[in-house]
UniProtKB/Swiss-Prot annotation:
Keywords attached to this entry: Cell inner membrane, Cell membrane, Cytoplasm, GTP-binding, Membrane, Nucleotide-binding, Ribosome biogenesis, RNA-binding, rRNA-binding
Recorded GO MF terms: GTP binding; GTPase activity; ribosomal small subunit binding; small ribosomal subunit rRNA binding
Protein name (record): GTPase Era
Similarity remark: Belongs to the TRAFAC class TrmE-Era-EngA-EngB-Septin-like GTPase superfamily. Era GTPase family.
């Protein structure tokens, strides 16, 4: 190699998009956060918590990896469900490569088999990522990996426990090596392409999931209405939680406002950690009839409105 060769030519940068595909609750959002090293996407035990495409951005060596956390793929019933599943598959087709996640405990169940069948139409290189390996015996993991590779021609197979971080570094390095040559698309210190207003709304939505255990969270959405930087270095945030019926509004508020206070306290603490400054969070709960059938709400969530 010539001594006068510029460093950027000696080590050309790489950059590409990686779509994470899998059934609900296989751990896609947890894996994105583990790969990035920071929380960029909502995590909950409840299914269907990721609604739109959220991108986490990782720099590993000379490569920038743009991770696309897609909604979980399942059999859609409602209009919102159809939009989420359609968005997930569009993310797979548009990416440079695909990471297919399997839950080690569930294995190749009916949902996974349906995803594998549709994956045959996706021509990009594919990695198989078996998650939650700490919960399953080694023999079962090896058998699952063999069965999956007999179904789909995966370039590589990885065993990870996203929650603890086990195996995540190996996956990150392999993704970096697989990225095509090209310039970085984002600043090196940027961890997500989602604006802070959106991340703050996602955090509050996560706290709704954690504080309420009925079907209600799937019939609610959060919008950041106001974000004001204060002279004392703090930030004042106003958010509205929209529900479809007045009975749902009462559930979110809770007896004596206890539930909304708990949601607000949890959300405020986490938003403050992300923005690195004190946060004054004000939550309002409003009824918006049939918001799940409003095209404008879909655009706000980054989803395409299904016509049928």
């Amino acid at each position: 190699m010539p001594d006068n060769m510029p460093e950027e030519q000696a080590h050309p940068t790489r950059c590409g998009f990686v779509a994470l595909i899998g059934a609900p609750n296989v751990g896609k959002s947890t894996l994105v956060n583990a790969l990035v090293g920071s929380k960029v996407t909502i995590v909950s035990r409840k299914v269907q918590t990721t609604r739109a495409l959220i991108r986490g951005i990782v720099v590993e060596g000379n490569a920038q990896i743009v991770l696309v956390d897609t909604p979980g793929i399942f059999t859609p019933k409602r209009r919102l469900d159809r939009a989420m599943v359609s968005t997930a598959w569009s993310g797979a087709h548009d990416a440079d490569m695909v990471c297919v996640l399997l839950d080690a405990r569930a294995g190749l169940d009916e949902e996974a088999e349906a995803i594998f069948t549709k994956l045959e139409a996706v021509k990009h290189p594919k990695f198989l990522v078996i998650n939650k390996i700490d919960l399953v015996a080694r023999e079962k993991l090896l058998a699952l990996a063999q069965r999956a590779n007999e179904r789909i021609a995966f370039r590589e197979t990885f065993m990870v426990a996203a929650l603890s971080g086990d195996g995540v570094d190996d996956l990150r390095r392999a993704l970096a090596a697989a990225m095509p040559e090209g310039p970085y698309l984002y600043p090196e210190d940027q961890m997500s392409d989602a604006p802070l207003r959106h991340l703050a709304a996602e955090i509050t939505r996560e706290k709704i999931y954690r504080n309420l255990h009925q079907e209600l969270p799937y019939q609610s959405t959060v919008e950041t209405e106001s974000w004001k930087e204060m002279r004392n270095g703090s930030v004042r945030i106003e958010q509205t939680i929209f529900v479809e019926r007045d009975s749902q509004r009462k559930i979110v508020l809770g007896k004596g406002g206890a539930t909304i206070k708990a949601i607000g306290a949890d959300a405020r603490k986490e938003i403050a950690e992300i923005v690195g400054q004190p946060v004054h969070l004000f939550l309002f709960v409003k009824v918006r009839d049939n918001w799940g059938d409003d095209p404008e709400r879909y655009r706000e969530m980054g989803l395409e409105f299904p016509k049928e």
